[in-house]
Amino acid sequence: MSNKIAILLLAVVVAVVACAQAQPSRRHHLVHPLLPRFLPRLHRDSNGHRVVGGFQIDVSDAPYQVSLQYFNSHRCGGSVLDNKWVLTAAHCTQGLDPSSLAVRLGSSEHATGGTLVGVLRTVEHPQYDGNTIDYDFSLMELETELTFSDAVQPVELPEHEEPVEPGTMATVSGWGNTQSAVESSDFLRAANVPTVSHEDCSDAYMWFGEITDRMLCAGYQQGGKDACQGDSGGPLVADGKLVGVVSWGYGCAQPGYPGVYGRVASVRDWVRENSGV
């Protein structure tokens, strides 16, 4: 009898281990925040992403777009809010000295042209969670005021909790990878993607973690178009308003996995209180 019990217990243990291995890790196929569309997107990737399946644009088509530079190398995207403030993702600035950061504006290339402006200070959302990538927002105050032109303009912000209906077409832009691999783009690119309902996005990412109320998803069910590493912190714009900040995702442009963005309307009051915008 004791041998039968031992065999039964061993079978149960093997079954449990096999089941655990068959289910995706909730946090490890995330893209690292800074890898995540910083780097790997999902891995709850937050590193940087490059637009996959998109098209090249001139910066005048997205004059609010900036390249966030870390020691003179492109790290993330960002959006101009006014002549002193830029919004990006918290995973793009966390733990970095502002003196090591600068933003390039008014150029279709992240490595040259336009204007390079230093960052005076960063204000990350106090509730940012690097494990869940929740509240993935960071404000950057610039060292000098910007001069607006056809190539440099602020983006309009939504009202607090202003809704975005599922299926709304939005444009994501950046210099991130043009494939899930590590091939990045020197020239600004964009892609048009439909927003996805909170319910459908939650179902897609059920094994990777919660899609919170501070998140907005966009992408095609069949994949093919998405933000990618290097695009983190960059803009998702719908009807002329900044509705999302590139945050994380599973790979890039993978079927069944829309891109996950920080939902700007959810922190509209925080942006106003900390930047005056």
From Swiss-Prot:
Cross-referenced PROSITE patterns: TRYPSIN_DOM, TRYPSIN_HIS, TRYPSIN_SER
SS bond partners: 76-92, 201-217, 228-252
A single Gene Ontology CC term: extracellular region
Active-site residues, as the UniProt record annotates them: 91 (charge relay system), 136 (charge relay system), 232 (charge relay system)
Induction (UniProt): By blood meal.
Segment forming the signal sequence: 1-19
GO molecular function, a single term: serine-type endopeptidase activity
Expression across tissues: Midgut.
Enzyme Commission number(s) from the entry: 3.4.21.4
InterPro entries given in the database record: Peptidase_S1, Peptidase_S1_PA, Peptidase_S1_PA_chymotrypsin, Peptidase_S1A, Trypsin_dom, TRYPSIN_HIS, TRYPSIN_SER
EC class name: hydrolase
Recorded family membership: Belongs to the peptidase S1 family.
Function comment: Major function may be to aid in digestion of the blood meal.
Name the record gives this protein: Trypsin-2
Lineage: Eukaryota, Metazoa, Ecdysozoa, Arthropoda, Hexapoda
Protein's gene: TRYP2
